Structures are given as structure tokens and as C-alpha cells.
Amino acid sequence: MKCYTQLTEGLYLGNQFSTSIITEINVIVSIGCKSKSTIPSIVNYKVSVRDSVDSDLTPLFGDVTEFIHINLSNNKKVLVHCQGGVNRSPIFAIAYLARYIMTLEEAVLHVSTLRSTVRIQPHYLHQLEKWLNDIIICKNQTNKL
């Protein structure tokens, strides 16, 4: 299994070792670990979160998915990674896909099909589902005004 997987045009998912292997990356989103990239031209976005049942990712989904979206919209190549590339980074990649491209169910299936080592913790998936529902409610309320 490669240490990284291409999910869409410009979006990659990987583990801690992928930061030093993918040469065409412009932006690295590091979830809970340090990027090993020392190339000055690469933008490093650090998200501090432990992989724990006590971790609440909800406040992070908005900023991280928007950051990914802005960079992909500017034709940047974005790598989202955590230590193992199994749980935390996949949930943020899924959050991006579900917010901007496809349904949550489609995003989970897409990512887990392309990267068979993905094992999303149920509490993270629940947090993401609630966050996405809150976005829909906010949009509906705004449209009524």
C-alpha cells in the first residue's frame, strides 16, 4: 500500500511519510502531527488534535475544509495527512468532499474504496454528520430571510 492516495484532482490523502515523497504538492494539511516537508515553497497548515474518543473535531471542520477548498480552487495540490493516514486525515478529507462535492455517504465510500486502510472512528463520523446537518440548517434559515 502506498503511503498516499489521490482522492480527486489535486487532493491527496496520506500518512506521515507521504510528505517527503510527493513532489508535486503545494500545500500540506497536517492533522495532529508535524509535516516532514522542509521545502520553503510548500504551505504547511497544522491542525492540533489528538486521536482520542475525547477529541471534538466539530470546531475544526469548517476552517480545514474551507482551507482545502480555497487551495484546490487556486489549482494547488493539497495533501491531507496524519500519522497513519487511517482515521484523522481521512475524516477531514471526507468532510471536504461531503461539504463541496458529494454526499457524506458517497464521500465515505469513495475514500474507503480508494484507500482500503481507512478506519474512521464512529465518534468522528457522528461529529461530521452533525456538523454537515448544522450547515444545511444554517443555509436553509439564511435562504428564508
What are these model-predicted stretches?
Residues 1-78, 98-136:
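Cysteine-based protein phosphatase catalytic domain of the PTP/DSP
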Residues 75-94:
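A phosphate-binding catalytic loop at a beta-strand-loop-alpha-helix junction
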Residues 89-91, 136-140:
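A eukaryotic "domain-to-IDR transition" signal
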Residues 144-145:
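Intrinsically disordered, low-complexity regulatory segments in eukaryotic proteins
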